[in-house]
Amino acid sequence: MGQKIHAFMFPWFAFGHMTPYLHLGNKLAEKGHRVTFLLPKKAQKQLEHQNLFPHGIVFHPLVIPHVDGLPAGAETASDIPISLVKFLSIAMDLTRDQIEAAIGALRPDLILFDLAHWVPEMAKALKVKSMLYNVMSATSIAHDLVPGGELGVAPPGYPSSKALYREHDAHALLTFSGFYKRFYHRFTTGLMNCDFISIRTCEEIEGKFCDYIESQYKKKVLLTGPMLPEPDKSKPLEDQWSHWLSGFGQGSVVFCALGSQTILEKNQFQELCLGIELTGLPFLVAVKPPKGANTIHEALPEGFEERVKGRGIVWGEWVQQPSWQPLILAHPSVGCFVSHCGFGSMWESLMSDCQIVFIPVLNDQVLTTRVMTEELEVSVEVQREETGWFSKENLSGAIMSLMDQDSEIGNQVRRNHSKLKETLASPGLLTGYTDKFVDTLENLVNEQGYIS
């Protein structure tokens, strides 16, 4: 056993990144290592309750500089629409002096980062090791190693003919296009210059994509597993929702959640509501109000609330509380999960007993959906038109292809999902990834002689 290390963590300013970083920080602290977590001041309040080792993990709040185009007070991705993410990335770059000062004062042995591509250069100058820890899918990294390829055509050496973009995915690529070139530069620069690469995944899901990344960058790729938090048994699902769900039959309720960054156009939001209504099943939808609307209520289709009264609810107040999602998925009445296939939601769906329907919105979500739907065959994807629009009929059809007891597709998907979940839930598998990662990291840092 080597010396204990002091690790800095500096993730992208989005809760979908900061949260798994903190879960990994908890694992490091559990093993006796020290963690300094660099994050925006406002984010600290929302993450403090997930710090299980406050004596081992110290939050280091950052002042987010003013940037023209970034709304006053915005410090995380959930504070802004996707179109403004580029300004948040500029603000992150402007914290460089604060990061450098913290490293100089606290002398860590290692800094983990993802989108701050300048970290390796700075860390090297200060004799600190750097690790790019990617919390999104390995598939999206592997695919984008060769940019600018033809849609539907695998890049050279890419290990899949299924996890690809297609013509009707242009909406997802265009949605993020303003940030995409910057993102690609950031990520590839970080991958090339860092000392170590680690990814929040496991071989059972993305092994061949991790091998491809390793072969391209000639660096060992360490896997942490999904970094799912331990269930907080002290905070069960609120009684009003538990009782409401319990009023329906086992496995009959459709739960839909599209993440804190997804804001649909009003007409697409209404089509989502109508599509779920069309199934005839009880449902619970947790989404943000659509563009141009202040509340969910004002944007609902005409007559919708009256038609679904007693069997359906569309709610807009949970999207900032992702810890509720696994509690809902675990309720025995919930039988189907409609999701955007964010990487955290993907793992939560896999570890549930629900049938899984994906409506990917952003580029990495599209590729992860293809792995789940076409490689592993544990879910279905809602088909979109060339414009990116999905119809109520396609949404309803996707849900019912899984929820109809006589559906051959539904039964096959359920068997595949059950088998994969059994593998992932086998004793020690996922915790083994984390334990191995921590031990390997400790050895790597000690071997390099940078322990302070």
From Swiss-Prot:
InterPro entries, per database record: UDP-glycosyltransf_plant, UDP_glucos_trans
User: What family does the entry list?
Assistant: Belongs to the UDP-glycosyltransferase family.
Protein name according to UniProt: UDP-glycosyltransferase 79B11
Matching Pfam families, A to Z?
Answer: UDPGT
GO MF annotation list: UDP-glucosyltransferase activity
Which UniProt keywords are listed? Answer: Glycosyltransferase, Transferase
Annotated S-S bridges: none
Query: So which domain of life are we looking at?
Result: Eukaryota
Glycosyltransferase among the record's keywords? yes
Positions of UDP-alpha-D-glucose binding = 260, 319-325, 340-348, 362-365
Provide the E.C. number(s) assigned to this enzyme.
2.4.1.-
Query: Could you list the residue ranges forming a coiled coil in this record?
Result: none
